[in-house]
Amino acid sequence: MKLALLTYNMARHWDLPTLLAQAGEIGFEGVELRTDRDHAHGVEVTLSEEERAKVKEQAEASGVEICGLSSGCKYDALEEAELREHIDHTKALIDLCADVGAPGLKVFGNNFHEEAGVSRDETMAQVAEALRECARLAQPRGVEIRFEMHGDFNPWKYCVRVVELAEEPNVSLIYNCDGRDVQGGSIAEVWRHVAPYVRHVHLHDLTDSFPYRELFRLLKEAGYQGYTSAELPDSADPERVLRYYRALWETYVREAG
């Protein structure tokens, strides 16, 4: 498995050359870029064709892969116009992924709206249909739609159901290391259900509040070869924190066998 840095908080102030240089020097194989938040990396749908080509060239020259883009697109809207806005923006981000060499795009569910008279089954069907529409555009462009286990769509049964309803091979799950998955100190039961669909992982602080050693063992046993992206709070000394993080990550990988 490989380690990436997600620029949700940590590293959001680094421009792209700095981000790629720091990630490579510290030992991160990839970066996952959060879009639509005016982060310093500047990789957004507003980039021109020439600017997108330059981003791809910079990443290739650095040896650090842009392993994905991370969006705020979600498909639970009660109003059709809002839903269509998110779908259309997803499609624009799919083009951006393909142009900069990012193989995947993170999206959400994100909430149920039973208080508005919409059943969970109805929302799951709506989300699945949106994923299907986006995935059919993404597949020929070599982009995977990565559905994060997030918000009301965790517990696992909801996100798995959505992926099954979407019925598209390039729709997958992002396992999000959520404390809600821990049952009796273990995530084994949840992992058993989601493992066939997981092709990306979001890590957080590698502390004992979540059974990370077990997660790394389960990933190893599953033959997981993908990225584990570190989604970390900001720090006044990010380089120092990331060096410690890389060292701890390597320890967990080594202990997993």
Segments and roles (model prediction):
Residues A21-G24, A53-E65, Y75-L173, R180-G184, ...:
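Active-site acidic/histidine proton-transfer and metal-coordination neighborhood
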